[in-house]
Amino acid sequence: MALKTRLGELLRPLNSQYGKVAPGWGTTPIMGIFMALFLLFLIIILQIYNSSLILENLDISWTTLGI
């Protein structure tokens, strides 16, 4: 016997769309935009890590991150 929870009842409408395909491109353009933004975020983090992005008056070192 399955346990019914409030969270399960809230998530049930999401599961009712299982297996259905949105017509046309659906949300693909939105996904592409978020992937591009995530790539930009990763590039900025990498540049900060490599110190190739110059941040004035901000000392970034592992010793300052320690507690």
Swiss-Prot record:
Q: Which GO terms describe its cellular component?
A: chloroplast thylakoid membrane; photosystem II
Kindly give the membrane topology term recorded for this protein.
Single-pass membrane protein
- The UniProt entry lists the main location of this chain as plastid
Q: Could you list the residue ranges that cross the membrane?
A: 29-49
**Pfam families linked:** PsbH
Q: Which UniProt keywords apply?
A: Chloroplast, Membrane, Photosynthesis, Photosystem II, Plastid, Thylakoid, Transmembrane, Transmembrane helix
Q: What does this protein do?
A: One of the components of the core complex of photosystem II (PSII), required for its stability and/or assembly. PSII is a light-driven water:plastoquinone oxidoreductase that uses light energy to abstract electrons from H(2)O, generating O(2) and a proton gradient subsequently used for ATP formation. It consists of a core antenna complex that captures photons, and an electron transfer chain that converts photonic excitation into a charge separation.
Spell out the PANTHER family in the cross-references. Answer: PHOTOSYSTEM II REACTION CENTER PROTEIN H (PTHR34469:SF4)
**Per the similarity annotation, which family is this?**
Belongs to the PsbH family.
Q: Which HAMAP family match?
A: PSII_PsbH
State the protein's name.
Photosystem II reaction center protein H
